[in-house]
């Protein structure tokens, strides 16, 4: 191993004999721009192998992958590539999708060249340009080295390795073309297939997730340390969350220590600076804890990829607005061991449920996840009337009564939908009956309020013989047959 403070000329002298056939300017550029800690992380022979991989990079070959099997059924996967926005997340997602447990990782990024190129720490949606001149000199590069092992029941034979290499190349090419969303969707689809095979009962919350920040060790980066149990797809989900929040990973190290996973991220803000605001650090800490616990429950979701995507948006909604109130609510949520698998099932249930309902009801979601178990799926009309009356009694105007009525309706619909999704034993007829009973009470109360308003304006409606005019509201179709469901509009 070379010392982290070794002179660059000394490093060049050591590596040159090991890099026969590699142009001197390629070797010099690589040594000059790589992170100093990189050279102490690997023996000279391995460093030379990385240089040779970097020398193969071209506009049509922006990524080179090497996979070596080691003792005990472990594999070392080395990825040398041009640097792209969301690249680390894409790589971690693919490794998880192939059923590989990441036991150790060393992630390094080279410095900018004299003419800056777009990268992890640049505009999230850059206009890609082809490298000019000699390949390997004009763009930042990454060297990501993972030690992995297949999870129980998973194989990683030669054919699997070839498939991973090909798919990594395709995903990196998509990033090169600026097709970030397409790359993420393809990774998500593969992740779904893998996580679906790991469906198991939820084992409760993880033990304490320890997170610390340090701004004293590095001159350029905030160091974020996370110590916890390993969870499926955490690195993928967390790296995506950081990227979407304009927090960039310049370097990362992770390994198993005393049976716990230790992740160390070297991070910067979108301007390439340390994160110094205590509020930003607290929000990042909360984001990491929520994602860590959520990915632990992810195999409960009907559609894990959909759940991950919705959870990231849900997290933004919870934390926006009053930051202090949002944090307080979210920390309380973290402490409830029963809510994460329920949230995973809800967010992974359907696009309709998230887009049309959960997004609008996010403020009520956390309390409802805790309280829903206390109420039955089907409430009697008498019970619903009593609860609705309590919700409306303080409303003094027609507009206030209408708002209270709609709020009660939305909360009850949410409760019924949630009970049906998270409790597999509930039957469709019972689900439909619960919605139909609610609809009866809502329509009845709407009639009472409208009748009171119109009577006040025009008096009671009467027939030509002066007797009160009777009328009825008839429910046809699914309402009349008590077969209402998710698409029914009340």
Language-model segments: residues:
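Non-catalytic regulatory/linker segments of enzymes
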Residues: 1-490
């Amino acid at each position: 191993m070379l010392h982290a403070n070794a002179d660059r000329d000394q490093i060049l002298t050591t590596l040159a004999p090991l890099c026969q056939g590699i142009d001197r300017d390629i070797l010099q550029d690589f040594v000059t721009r790589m992170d100093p800690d990189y050279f102490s992380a690997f023996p000279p022979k391995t460093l030379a192998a990385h240089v040779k991989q970097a020398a193969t990079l071209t506009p049509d070959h922006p990524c080179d992958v090497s996979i070596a099997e080691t003792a005990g059924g472990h594999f070392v996967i080395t990825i040398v590539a041009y640097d792209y926005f969301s690249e680390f997340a894409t790589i971690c997602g693919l490794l998880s999708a192939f059923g590989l447990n990441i036991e150790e990782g060393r992630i390094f990024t080279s410095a900018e060249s004299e003419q800056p190129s777009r990268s992890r720490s640049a505009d999230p949606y850059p206009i890609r340009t082809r490298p000019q001149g000699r390949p390997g000199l004009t763009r930042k590069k990454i060297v990501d080295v993972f030690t992995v092992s297949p999870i129980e029941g998973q194989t990683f034979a030669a054919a699997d390795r070839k498939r991973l290499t090909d798919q990594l190349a395709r995903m990196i090419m998509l990033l090169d073309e600026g097709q970030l969303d397409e790359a993420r969707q393809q990774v998500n689809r593969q992740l779904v297939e893998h996580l679906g095979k790991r469906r198991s009962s939820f084992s409760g919350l993880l033990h304490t997730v320890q997170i610390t920040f340090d701004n004293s060790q590095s001159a350029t980066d905030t160091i974020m340390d996370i110590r916890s149990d390993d969870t499926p797809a955490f690195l993928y989900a967390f790296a995506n969350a950081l990227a979407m929040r304009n927090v960039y990973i310049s370097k990362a190290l992770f390994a198993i220590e005393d049976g716990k996973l230790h992740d160390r991220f070297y991070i910067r803000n979108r301007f390439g600076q340390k994160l110094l605001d205590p509020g930003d650090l607290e929000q990042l800490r909360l984001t990491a804890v929520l994602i860590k616990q959520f990915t632990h429950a992810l195999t409960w979701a009907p559609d894990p990829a959909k759940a991950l995507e919705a959870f990231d948006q849900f997290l933004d909604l919870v934390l926006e607005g009053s930051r202090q109130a949002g944090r307080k609510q979210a920390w309380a949520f973290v402490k409830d061991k029963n809510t994460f698998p329920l949230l995973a099932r809800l967010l992974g249930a359907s696009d309709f449920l998230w887009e049309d309902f959960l997004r609008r009801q996010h403020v009520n979601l956390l309390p409802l996840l805790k309280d829903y178990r206390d109420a039955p799926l089907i409430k009697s009309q008498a019970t619903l009337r009593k609860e609705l009356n309590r919700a409306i009694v303080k409303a003094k105007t027609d507009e206030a009564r209408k708002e209270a009525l709609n709020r009660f309706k939305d909360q009850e619909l949410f409760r019924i939908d949630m009970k049906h999704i998270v409790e597999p034993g509930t039957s469709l007829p019972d689900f439909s009956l619960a919605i139909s009973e609610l609809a009866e009470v809502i329509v009845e109360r709407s009639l009472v309020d409208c009748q009171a308003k119109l009577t006040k304006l025009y008096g009671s409606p009467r027939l030509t013989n002066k007797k009160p005019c009777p009328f009825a509201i008839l429910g046809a179709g699914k309402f009349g047959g008590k077969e209402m469901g998710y698409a029914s509009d009340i």
